[in-house]
């Protein structure tokens, strides 16, 4: 178990056969290749996908991104799931002076309370091993805290302290770690309501909400749907090396569907 925690793919109990070893090796290679392929695809998506649309809302968002890219201000992006919050955050990073540095995402909604601080701050172990958290991995770059409303309430005070001091300690660590990051947060919930209900710290909210961006569902800007269809047909065809699919943009279902996620 300790070996796997430190990075081993699998352990084999004695006695073992040649076939079993080959099977584990093949599975490890397959896992490695899948991760490599995933990284390549994500890198292509990061550098190729654009914020598509001609609606007044998208034009406004593009202008805001242009302004924010020239600053290091914290940004809070609000909007329903699937409205493009991560894409906006990536565009701000890509157009900023930090574009050559890491863009790290930590999704608060996917983490349990006990593991959140470990994922954010990292952890030190008695044997000297270090598990680096999102803050350190994002140093000099941009950290996106996705679904920031889901940060455990007890952890919110520690996040606030990092924003004030620009330093933190790893779990089980005694040394202060200084970081230089741009923080972007996103949420699909109303943080003002959570503050009123004492579910989110008001002081942290104001620290995060320096430059707010509001995004709406695609259902409120249906004039962008034909452009998005055209764009994604071309991009996905290019990435996957397949012929562009035929899609009838006159189909009413495209404009009445609520496009969740």
Range-by-range predicted roles:
Residues 1, 81, 187:
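Conserved phosphate-coupling serine/threonine residues in phosphotransfer and NTP-handling enzymes
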Residues 13-16, 64-127, 136-152, 217-222:
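Conserved post-Walker A coupling segment in P-loop NTPases
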């Amino acid at each position: 178990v300790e070996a796997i925690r430190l990075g081993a793919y699998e352990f084999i109990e004695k006695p073992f056969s040649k076939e079993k070893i080959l099977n584990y090796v093949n599975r490890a290679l397959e896992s490695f290749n899948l991760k490599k392929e995933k990284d390549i695809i994500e890198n292509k998506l990061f550098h190729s996908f654009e914020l598509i649309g001609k609606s007044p809302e998208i034009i406004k968002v593009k202008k805001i991104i242009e302004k924010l890219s020239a600053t290091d201000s914290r940004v809070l992006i609000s909007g329903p799931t699937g409205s493009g919050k991560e894409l906006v955050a990536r565009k701000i990073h890509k157009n900023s002076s930090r574009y050559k540095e890491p863009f790290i995402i930590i999704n608060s909604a996917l983490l349990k309370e006990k593991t959140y601080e470990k994922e954010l701050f990292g952890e030190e172990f008695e044997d000297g091993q270090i598990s680096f958290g999102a803050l350190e991995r994002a140093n000099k770059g941009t950290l996106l805290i996705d679904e920031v409303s889901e940060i455990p309430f007890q952890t919110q005070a520690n996040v606030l302290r990092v924003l004030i001091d620009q330093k933190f300690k790893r779990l089980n660590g005694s040394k202060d770690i200084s970081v230089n990051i741009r923080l972007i947060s996103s949420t699909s919930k109303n943080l003002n309501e959570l503050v009123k209900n004492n579910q989110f710290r008001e002081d942290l909210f104001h620290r995060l909400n320096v430059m707010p961006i509001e995004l709406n569902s695609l259902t409120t800007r249906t004039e962008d749907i034909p452009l998005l269809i055209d764009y994604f047909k071309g991009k996905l065809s290019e990435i996957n090396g397949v012929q562009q699919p035929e899609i009838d943009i006159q189909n009413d279902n495209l404009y009445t569907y609520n496009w969740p996620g």
